[in-house]
Structure formats: C-alpha cells, structure tokens
Amino acid sequence: MEKTLVILKPCTVQRGLIGEIVTRFEKKGLRLAGMKMVWLTDEILSEHYAHLKEKPFFQRIKDAMSVCPVIVCCWEGVDAIHVVRTLAGTTNGRNAAPGTIRGDYSMSVQENIVHASDSPETAEIELKRFFKDDEIFDYELKNLLSLYANDEF
C-alpha cells in the first residue's frame, strides 16, 4: 500500500475543520497510519519549502504556516498519493472543483486547507521529515475487502 503525507494547515486548525477533513479521507477508504500536532519551526519550513526559496512569496508562506500548530497525517491506500491529491483539488481554492476539499473550504491559493505530497519520492522524504519510524502504524483495516477487490491490494 502506498503512503502519503497530508498537512492540515493552520487555516484548517483555526477554522475548526480538522475533523471534517480527516473524515473526508476516511470516508474515501484511506487508512490513517500516523497523526500528530506539531508547531513547524523556521528550519523545518525552510527545508519543506526549499523549492520555493527564490519566490517572492516564500517568507509569506513560512509566516502563514507558523501561525499555529498543524496536523501532520500519514495516509495509506492503493494509489494514495493520487487519491489524496484528487480529493484535495487544485492548489487555488477559487479554481478547485466543488466536492473537493479546496473547492468546498478554500478561496485562496495559500490558505488552501491541506498540503499533500505530489509523488512517491516526495512522500517518502516528507514522511521522514515529519514522522519517526515508530510513529507510523501498521494495522489491519477490517473493512479492506469492502474497499478493494481482493487482487487490488
């Protein structure tokens, strides 16, 4: 099963949407393998957003992501990265389709509810950045056969 990182951003925490967003992923059939609240440091933010370092909005993103703690989650499932990104919707909430998380809860390109890993390579790096090995749990999901055909997992 594929694993991916989701960060519930400060705007999600501030608006009291944590439960609703987690429920969306659970209802889809993803398995929550790890979850914790963390306050992102400047060092972690600089590492996480290093690909945006030269952009004029780099500091604004770091400032927004350190307003309050965030919730980091490890979700698991068949094609979990693609599934999570599809559920999340396009980055700009104003353009995201209704029915997606951003389409339903966001009007912003920055305050867009969640961060989601964009590839298996990125997911591996990001999960190691935010979780220790003993913070990711492997357990049997009792409804697995209700979610997938027996040859899909």
Curated annotation (Swiss-Prot):
<dbReference type="GO" id="GO:0004550">
    <property type="term" value="F:nucleoside diphosphate kinase activity"/>
</dbReference>
<feature type="binding site">
    <location>
        <position position="112"/>
    </location>
    <ligand>
        <name>ATP</name>
    </ligand>
</feature>
<dbReference type="InterPro" id="IPR036850">
    <property type="entry name" value="NDK-like_dom_sf"/>
</dbReference>
<dbReference type="InterPro" id="IPR001564">
    <property type="entry name" value="Nucleoside_diP_kinase"/>
</dbReference>
<feature type="binding site">
    <location>
        <position position="9"/>
    </location>
    <ligand>
        <name>ATP</name>
    </ligand>
</feature>
<dbReference type="InterPro" id="IPR034907">
    <property type="entry name" value="NDK-like_dom"/>
</dbReference>
<keyword id="KW-0597">Phosphoprotein</keyword>
<keyword id="KW-0546">Nucleotide metabolism</keyword>
<comment type="function">
    <text>Major role in the synthesis of nucleoside triphosphates other than ATP. The ATP gamma phosphate is transferred to the NDP beta phosphate via a ping-pong mechanism, using a phosphorylated active-site intermediate.</text>
</comment>
<keyword id="KW-0479">Metal-binding</keyword>
<keyword id="KW-0067">ATP-binding</keyword>
<comment type="similarity">
    <text>Belongs to the NDK family.</text>
</comment>
<feature type="active site" description="Pros-phosphohistidine intermediate">
    <location>
        <position position="115"/>
    </location>
</feature>
<feature type="binding site">
    <location>
        <position position="57"/>
    </location>
    <ligand>
        <name>ATP</name>
    </ligand>
</feature>
<keyword id="KW-0963">Cytoplasm</keyword>
<keyword id="KW-0418">Kinase</keyword>
<feature type="binding site">
    <location>
        <position position="102"/>
    </location>
    <ligand>
        <name>ATP</name>
    </ligand>
</feature>
<dbReference type="GO" id="GO:0005524">
    <property type="term" value="F:ATP binding"/>
</dbReference>
<feature type="binding site">
    <location>
        <position position="85"/>
    </location>
    <ligand>
        <name>ATP</name>
    </ligand>
</feature>
<protein>
    <recommendedName>
        <fullName>Nucleoside diphosphate kinase</fullName>
        <ecNumber>2.7.4.6</ecNumber>
    </recommendedName>
</protein>
<feature type="binding site">
    <location>
        <position position="91"/>
    </location>
    <ligand>
        <name>ATP</name>
    </ligand>
</feature>
<dbReference type="Pfam" id="PF00334">
    <property type="entry name" value="NDK"/>
</dbReference>
<keyword id="KW-0460">Magnesium</keyword>
<dbReference type="GO" id="GO:0006241">
    <property type="term" value="P:CTP biosynthetic process"/>
</dbReference>
<dbReference type="GO" id="GO:0006183">
    <property type="term" value="P:GTP biosynthetic process"/>
</dbReference>
<keyword id="KW-0547">Nucleotide-binding</keyword>
<dbReference type="GO" id="GO:0006228">
    <property type="term" value="P:UTP biosynthetic process"/>
</dbReference>
<keyword id="KW-0808">Transferase</keyword>
<dbReference type="GO" id="GO:0005737">
    <property type="term" value="C:cytoplasm"/>
</dbReference>
<comment type="subunit">
    <text>Homotetramer.</text>
</comment>
<dbReference type="InterPro" id="IPR023005">
    <property type="entry name" value="Nucleoside_diP_kinase_AS"/>
</dbReference>
<dbReference type="GO" id="GO:0046872">
    <property type="term" value="F:metal ion binding"/>
</dbReference>
